[in-house]
Amino acid sequence: MANIKSAKKRAIQSEKRRQHNASRRSMTRTYLKKVIAAIASGDKAAAVAAFATAQPIMDRMATKGLIHKNKAARHKSRLSAQIKAMA
């Protein structure tokens, strides 16, 4: 454990941020799983609705630096293509 006051503060802040980021990352994965499950079930309306919910969350996480912007774009592109292919 750190001995210097500023180092102690940084350690506390780091842990707080780690937990916050883990929560956000988990939430993002959950929304992605909902879209994937809707696609797997074959229900296009549910898939479109789930994708519409997940898309801004992916963008927000990319903007905040939680995931890379290219990863967010890749997920959105692949899910969108899968939904379009459902026809």
UniProtKB/Swiss-Prot annotation:
Could you name the domain of life of the organism this protein comes from?
Bacteria
Q: Provide GO CC annotations from the record.
A: cytosol; small ribosomal subunit
The disulfides recorded in the entry are none
Query: What keywords were assigned to this record?
Result: Ribonucleoprotein, Ribosomal protein, RNA-binding, rRNA-binding
A GO MF label: small ribosomal subunit rRNA binding
Region of interest (Disordered), ranges: 1-27
Q: Which InterPro entries does the record match to this protein?
A: Ribosomal_bS20 (IPR002583), Ribosomal_bS20_sf (IPR036510)
A single GO BP annotation from the record?
Answer: translation
- Output the Pfam families linked to this UniProt entry: Ribosomal_S20p
Instruction: Report the family membership.
Output: Belongs to the bacterial ribosomal protein bS20 family.
Role of this protein = Binds directly to 16S ribosomal RNA.
Protein's name in the database: Small ribosomal subunit protein bS20
> Which organism is this protein's natural source?
Aeromonas salmonicida (strain A449)
Q: Which gene encodes it?
A: rpsT
